[in-house]
Amino acid sequence: MKRQQSGFTLIELVMVIVLIGVLAAVAIPKFVDLGSDARAAAAAGVAGGLASAAAVNYAARKANAAKGAIVDDCQDVAGLLQGGLPAGYEITSLAITADATVTCTVTGPNTTTATFVATGIS
């Protein structure tokens, strides 16, 4: 009486191990590089906060000239944030005339940059 043997051959097992190795070699660099994605997201978050602060300030000052702050340079927007600009971030200086809209650049740690829109108000 012959017994039926079942299972994987050595070649099948080696092929599976090789395939797992190739997949790991492709996937691991993506997980290692998540730091740059996090820095870009942080800079974009700061830029979003700056854009919101600039828009709220513009609306408040248009409604009542005694409220809000004068914005005639991109760097003035940093003063509109509660607590100021986070440590390690800086805004590139760019003049803004009254009622003009410009695109400003904020630079974060490791030279990560993001842009935001600001409108000048006097």
Where are these regions (language model features)?
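Short extracytoplasmic/periplasmic juxtamembrane "stem" segments immediately C-terminal to an N-terminal membrane anchor
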Residues: G45-A53
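Low-complexity, intrinsically disordered short peptide segments enriched in small/polar/basic residues
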Residues: F8-I11, M15, A25, A43, ...
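Short alpha-helical interface patches
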Residues: I20, S36-A42, C74-Q82
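Periplasmic/extracellular, small/polar-rich flexible segments of pilin-like filament-forming proteins
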Residues: S52-S122
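Aliphatic-rich helix starts adjacent to a transmembrane/signal segment
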Residues: Q4-Q5, V32-V46, R61
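N-terminal single-pass transmembrane signal-anchor helix
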Residues: K2-F31, G35
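Short, intrinsically disordered low-complexity segments
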Residues: M1-K2, P29, A60, A66
